[in-house]
Amino acid sequence: DAVAEGATLTVYAGGDIVTVDDAQPGVEALAVKDGRILAVGPRADIEKAHKGAATRRVDLGGKTLLPGFIDAHGHYINSLLVANQAKLYAPPAGPGKDVDSIIAALQAFAAERKIPAGQMIMAYGYDESVMPGGRHLNRDDLDKAFPDNPVRVDHVSMHGGVLNSRAQEYYGISAATETPPGGVIVRKPGTNEPYGLIMETAFLPVFGKSEPMTPEQEIEWSRAGQMLYAEAGVTTAHEGATHIAPFQTMQRATEAGANIIDVVAFPFITDLEKL
């Protein structure tokens, strides 16, 4: 139905509504006002009790309505960056089924964003475990497609990534770079040149060199990052091991009214007194 002007009460019906209440696990209809659930029950009863010109009616069309999900373990602050990167998830979530598909997605992203020569191209979601025939993404693949740009393709775990030559130079990684304890640097066969994934402790210097956001980007990217959660039905995000800088970013975004979901932050023990 059309949304009534100034409507603050919404009735959902026409699909499966899951309550997560053992006494009444499923209902036909649900009424919401100002972000709070007023009533659940049979469709006829709910629509009769909440009728009027100010009521918005939503027909679920046979789809399922679920309560908002709560992220119990995550790193919300990373979503601000991910929202502004090429998405290379493996199917069905994304296009990253093989190297050619990954390169095509990167090229489309760079063209859409009009990224100039010399500017970093960043992506997220690469998963080497799904690459057919063990053919993994490597430095040469990225160099061939992007000879004039540094390219950083972060792993789906966020614990590593693949860099092209220009990105390796930017982050100070070379054949002379030793693999630290607990780290992985995949090297070109027969050489010491970094070639594929850089993971765990070897990736920390890369992860820690992200460009700071401008005040405008903090607001814009906070909304974009939170939309990634909202689109997946997550209404509470979690930021684990929160250091002072990301905490301040979240605080400024909150003060600017940028939040569309709840965010729970757990301060890192070494920064607790500063916060």
Predicted regions mapped to residue ranges:
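Divalent metal-binding segments
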Residues: 4-13, 18, 22-275
